[in-house]
Curated annotation (Swiss-Prot):
UniProt key word DNA repair: no
Chief site of localization: cytoplasm
GO cellular-component term (any): cytoplasm
Listed EC numbers: 2.1.1.166
Lineage: Bacteria, Pseudomonadati, Pseudomonadota, Gammaproteobacteria, Lysobacterales
Source species of the chain: Stenotrophomonas maltophilia (strain R551-3)
Name of this protein: Ribosomal RNA large subunit methyltransferase E
Stretches the record annotates as Disordered: 187-210
Function: Specifically methylates the uridine in position 2552 of 23S rRNA at the 2'-O position of the ribose in the fully assembled 50S ribosomal subunit.
Length: 210
């Protein structure tokens, strides 16, 4: 118990001294994750006016907030999450599990006949702290996001997803390379150094898989 207490105290100290946490609080952003996305979007110039962007696993809303901030009043930001999320100006939120047909039908009705330019996924499982449990759960969510992009992202579009390095990671990246003209692995500055998370970016979705 003492070890857990020390670990919790260390996490809290690190969290509140984190410059990205302070920046998020100062700028009214919902999470420090917004700055991971900011770096990724700007590095690869992923956003343009009038784009349609889908944010999977959107709660608490930092990524959707960042996208809306960057594209201004143009385009659409559609956010989905199994967790509820307080409203965000300029963001269309659907509360539900996109694996369910009813939720998927609602999403498709929201989307109408507009093509999706960019699919984002910052989804992650609730961590148990046991890698042998967490990694398969993470890869399962990643497969769901990849399947979603297969079915809803336009040809030529881009897909950005958070992954944990570990079992299944290399196979997943290979699967992405079959689907996209260019695949890059990124570790933004706002990612904590000890974290296994990286971001995989697929650009130029192919009409047909290799």
């Amino acid at each position: 118990m003492a070890t857990r207490s020390k670990s919790s105290q260390r996490w809290l100290k690190e969290h509140f001294s984190d410059p990205f946490v302070k920046k998020a609080q100062a700028e009214g952003m919902r999470s420090r994750a917004a700055y991971k996305l900011e770096e990724l979007l700007e590095r690869d110039r992923l956003l343009k006016p009038h784009m349609v962007v889908v944010d999977l696993g959107a709660a608490p809303g930092g990524w959707s907030q960042q996208v809306r901030r960057q594209i201004g009043d143009t385009g659409r930001v559609l956010a989905l999450d199994i967790l509820d999320m307080p409203p965000l100006a300029g963001v269309e939120f659907l509360h539900g599990d996109f694996r369910e047909e009813t939720v998927l039908s609602q999403f498709e009705a929201m989307l109408g006949d507009q093509p999706v330019d960019l699919v984002l996924s910052d989804m992650a499982p609730n961590k148990s702290g046991v890698g042998a449990v967490d990694q398969p759960r993470m890869m399962h969510l990643a497969e769901l996001a990849l399947d979603f992009a297969d079915n809803h992202l336009k040809t030529g579009g881009a897909f950005l997803i958070k992954l944990f390095q570990g079992e299944g990671f290399d196979d997943y990246v290979r699967d992405m390379r079959r689907r996209y003209d260019k695949v890059s692995i990124r570790k933004p500055e706002a990612s904590r150094k000890r974290s296994p998370e990286v971001y995989a970016l697929g650009q130029g979705k192919r009409a047909h898989m290799k």
